[in-house]
Amino acid sequence: MTQSEILEVAKSQSGMTQKEFAEYFGIPYRTVQDWFAGRRNMPDYVLRLMIYKLEMEKKVQGLSKELEQN
């Protein structure tokens, strides 16, 4: 998969728009647009960190829901 395809999957799973995705990570919207369009590539470590943050956020939300139920 290309970086832009991986980003699209991550964005879709997060339920965010491109603009929300950019704001969430504190990245200029135009840069994010270029990443999604494949006009610009980011360093691989940035992509890994973004995915890691999304995964951890999802886990934290899951734990919060569990705690609320108890």
Question: For each predicted feature, which ranges?
Answer:
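A short, Lys/Arg-rich alpha-helix, primarily the initiator
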Residues: 1-13, 51-52
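Alpha-helical structural elements of signaling/regulatory helical domains
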Residues: 16, 41-42
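Short alpha-helical "recognition helix" segments of helix-turn-helix
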Residues: 20-22
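Recognition helix of helix-turn-helix/homeodomain-like DNA-binding domains
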Residues: 27-41
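DNA major-groove recognition helix of helix-turn-helix/homeodomain DNA-binding modules
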Residues: 44-63
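Short acidic DE-rich linear segments
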Residues: 62-70
